[in-house]
């Protein structure tokens, strides 16, 4: 009889041992889920894997966000905490909307190289709400057409899978690299079509931007 009581106590849902056991099972299950998500990408291209974010992405992403070359046209370089917050927001966007900015891997060696993907801007201006295509890659991977390759796949996903009718993008007019990518996506730029980014102080050198868009039927329309 004592043996029976002892066995029951080890399985008692109120016992500390049971709680520890369930936490261990949950943690193991969570790791399996995370591993599955990371190993099963959202999109693949000839050279890229676009997937959900993992913990191992945080350090290289922070290095990238502290690189003055990468952040040339942004308001500031980011601290590790600010960079991690971007990862958290990207994952929150996936949970809320079912899509978001994807972590980008180079297929050749599975190296994390930045992000590419769709998101809903958090600020309000005359062309929002909208869905934006954006990208940010480590400087070592510039000039190889990777941003264009990944962005094309993301735009196609937005139109064909999500059923979007229009996708927008915006950049600082001086950012020639991003403008070239936008042009390759079928977007157009006009110097007259600029706006002040509402999340930056008036007159900030990175505050002036131009938004452009491409419609699902391939007709380019300006959104400025």
Residue spans for each PLM region:
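Extreme N-terminal basic, low-complexity initiation segments
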Residues: 1-13
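Cationic, low-complexity basic patches in intrinsically disordered or flexible, solvent-exposed regions
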Residues: 8, 20-23, 224
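Intrinsically disordered, low-complexity repeat tracts enriched in Pro/Ser/Thr
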Residues: 13-14, 22
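Acyl-donor (CoA/ACP) binding surface of acyl/acetyltransferases
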Residues: 15, 26-73, 101, 105-224
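Conserved GNAT-fold acetyl-CoA-binding loop/helix
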Residues: 69-90, 100-102
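Short loop/turn motifs at secondary-structure junctions and domain boundaries
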Residues: 93-97
């Amino acid at each position: 009889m004592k043996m029976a009581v002892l066995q029951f106590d080890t399985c008692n849902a109120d016992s500390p041992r049971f709680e520890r056991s369930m936490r261990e099972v949950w943690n193991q299950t969570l790791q399996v889920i995370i591993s599955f998500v990371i190993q099963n990408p959202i999109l693949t291209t000839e050279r890229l894997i676009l997937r959900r974010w993992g913990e191992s992405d945080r350090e290289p992403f922070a290095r990238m966000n502290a690189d003055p070359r990468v952040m040339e046209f942004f308001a500031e370089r980011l601290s590790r905490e600010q960079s991690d917050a971007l990862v958290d927001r990207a994952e929150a966007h996936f949970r809320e909307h079912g899509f978001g900015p994807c972590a980008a891997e180079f297929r050749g060696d599975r190296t994390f190289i930045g992000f590419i993907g769709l998101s809903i801007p958090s600020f309000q201006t005359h062309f929002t709400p909208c869905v934006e295509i954006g990208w940010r890659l480590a400087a070592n991977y510039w000039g190889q057409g990777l941003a264009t390759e990944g962005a094309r796949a993301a735009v196609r996903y937005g139109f064909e899978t999500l059923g979007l009718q229009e996708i927008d993008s915006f950049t600082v007019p001086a950012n020639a690299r991003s403008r070239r990518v936008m042009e390759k996506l079928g977007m157009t730029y006009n110097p007259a079509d600029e706006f002040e980014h509402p999340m930056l102080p008036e007159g900030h050198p990175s505050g002036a931007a131009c938004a452009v868009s491409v419609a699902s039927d391939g007709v380019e329309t300006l959104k400025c």
